[in-house]
């Protein structure tokens, strides 16, 4: 009953509170913003350290409206619709249709909705929790008392090349068809509110006993540990969030800040097989050092409580987008995807973004930026541990740089190379890390 009353109160606030308009584009960027409908898109020919060489296409359709529109100077676009077909040589598929409409039909609401099919036959599972994250990679062999430990991921690969029975020891397979709908509303000039729902069916399989390159695989780490979620199932959850946003332009900020809190709840009333909650907070800050040079900073924290399946532990549930962590191009570059996972995770990122060139041709605007970054993150077992037992010496660090291209300001393509003491990573993908 209390949950029902709380939901009703939240919905009443959501639909009745008034606001004024959001942060405005600079005059320089406003002059570059084109009017009306236009397409963009790229063939997806890229490489990712976790997923191998990828190929496919992502096509965008934008509508910016006209300069006379009330929200032209405030919204990143009037509508963004994209469709994606993508698969890789390492067995990853991600196909999606996504629609984003800020100030939909001239109202103060925004909707983001997506339907996606996500399949991976080499998803990573390195264990979970603080002890696992701060220890060495450990491979338990077929004998219960025997194990191998590795200082780096490359050391493990060298071992597995010699004993191919363990090539898939840290891998498993999943399929995740999903749908989500997020509805946002401005409360004040910069304060925004979110309610949303995600529905996802997860199917899990292991490599144990199957053949890879003709070699039968030994029992994998996932099968040895059999964490909650090992059998897959429905993972449905509702979301609510509130954030304060003064950024000048959401896809590619140069100034301003974002303070964000989001709450997620999953239980059987939503048709979920799991009962858990998640709290996530983040701060983003953008400081223009020079006209063409921006310092971008982010700090994030997330905590999951209850019966959280292992495949949901590795997420930061930010209001505008959920990000996998810790590892790969969305949180901790220089490490494998979801290399460090636990109930409580922290992340911090610093980037320098320098626009060194700009070109205009056939009515299209292209901006080219060099970026240098430094990332850190850690895993904890309890919500208060980052503050009461921070273990600063255990923070994992990654660094590197790359190229970012902004196409008509709204379509962001990045080329990152990240390094760490354990591994390196390459990423060619859309959007900034933050």
Language-model features: locations:
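Short loop/turn motifs that connect adjacent beta-strands in outer-membrane beta-barrel proteins
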Residues: 23-38, 65-78, 104-111, 188-193, ...
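Gram-negative/organellar outer-membrane beta-barrel architecture
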Residues: 30-41, 45-228, 234, 330, ...
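Hydrophobic, lipid-facing positions within transmembrane beta-strands of outer-membrane proteins
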Residues: 39-41, 55-57, 93-97, 175-181, ...
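Membrane-embedded beta-strand positions of outer-membrane beta-barrel proteins
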Residues: 41-43, 81-83, 111-115, 195, ...
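Structural signature of outer-membrane beta-barrel channels/translocons
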Residues: 46, 62-64, 100-104, 184-188, ...
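Sequence/structural signature of outer-membrane beta-barrel proteins
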Residues: 62-66, 86-90, 104, 118-122, ...
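Extracellular loop and loop/strand-boundary signature of outer-membrane beta-barrel proteins
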Residues: 83-85, 164-169, 223-229, 265-271, ...
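C-terminal outer-membrane beta-barrel translocator/porin domains of Gram-negative envelope proteins
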Residues: 222, 228, 235-243, 247-362
